[in-house]
């Protein structure tokens, strides 16, 4: 999408400093393609991004931000956390590491103390619906927003994904349906709402310092090995997947094995591209990466690009108490 370009355009329209502008990506497996990914190039099920949609999408990012700045009003902020249980977990193992904490920031108008906005950070792939869904959906976060806005009419909900590269609802779902997305999303909404209702007037602050900072970091590139090794890995993954299906294994292990096949297929493409010398130019476009931190009072929003595993976020939050990772 060109985050640097958006930041320049947004600064020109609003005057905000670049380090105070965060563009947070949502995540769904039930929406239009918005990027070109090397590992998908041979996948017949993944279409190219639609230029007309992308033009509207990019314009919408700018206009949404400009509207937020232009309608700013005096407010007070409270920060809390909710404990989430039953929405999802580690996607590789039912008892694997995951993060139960939901970071919650509530903004209310000073004039009448009515809720204005709620920002939440939750580490979980919103993938109740799978890639075979033909309807555009934000998956279970939609139903989380519904619960919150029904309880607080007029509320604007900002839903941020935390690091969830190895997290999903797969061991908690009963099916890949909208009803199931509603069940999990509403559960999360009620858990957040419970935390919000525990807040009192003393928890809201008006005298908060707001600041931001950015830096660049060089990431070591992953090497994909030989094409032969990647193809062997793919064969093994397919054999495991087919065996689990034959044995009638539960949904969680079968879906994990299926996603392992997807990953192995992509590794073959990437190994071929690396062998052909195609990956260096692409890596140069994305490296170094930009890291960002936003401070609102004593709360830090650490903003990381990509789809990090949850262990990185847990380690960071242990080192920086009170921080949330987006």
Language model feature labels by segment:
Residues 1-326:
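Non-catalytic substrate/cofactor recognition surfaces at enzyme active-site rims
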């Amino acid at each position: 999408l060109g985050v640097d370009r958006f930041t320049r355009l947004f600064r020109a329209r609003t005057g905000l400093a670049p380090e105070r502008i965060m563009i947070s990506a949502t995540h769904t497996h039930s929406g239009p393609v918005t990027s070109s990914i090397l590992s998908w190039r041979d996948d017949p099920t993944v279409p190219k991004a639609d230029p007309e949609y992308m033009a509207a999408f990019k314009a919408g990012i700018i206009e949404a931000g400009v509207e937020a700045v232009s309608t700013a009003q005096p407010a007070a902020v409270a920060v809390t956390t909710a404990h989430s249980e039953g929405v999802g977990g580690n996607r590789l193992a039912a008892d694997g590491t995951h993060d139960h904490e939901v970071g919650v920031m509530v903004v209310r108008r000073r004039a009448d103390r009515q809720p204005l906005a709620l920002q939440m950070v939750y580490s979980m792939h919103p993938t109740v619906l799978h890639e075979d869904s033909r309807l555009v959906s934000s998956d279970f976060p939609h139903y989380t927003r519904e619960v919150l806005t029904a309880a607080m009419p007029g509320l604007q909900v900002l839903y941020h994904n935390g690091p969830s590269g190895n997290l999903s609802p797969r061991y908690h779902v009963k099916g890949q349906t909208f009803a199931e997305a509603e069940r999990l999303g509403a559960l999360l909404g009620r858990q957040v709402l419970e935390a919000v209702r525990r807040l009192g007037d003393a928890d809201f602050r008006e005298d908060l310092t707001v600041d931001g900072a950015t830096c660049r970091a060089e990431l070591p590139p992953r090497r994909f090995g030989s094409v032969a090794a990647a193809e062997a890995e793919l064969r093994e993954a397919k054999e495991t997947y087919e065996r689990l299906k034959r044995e009638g294994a539960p949904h969680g292990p079968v879906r994990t094995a299926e996603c392992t096949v997807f990953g192995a297929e992509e590794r073959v493409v990437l190994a071929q591209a690396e062998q052909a010398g195609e990956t260096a130019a692409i890596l140069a476009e994305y490296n170094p990466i930009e890291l960002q931190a936003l401070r609102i009072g004593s709360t830090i929003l650490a903003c990381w690009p990509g789809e990090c595993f949850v262990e990185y976020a847990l380690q960071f939050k242990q080192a920086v108490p009170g921080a949330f990772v987006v």
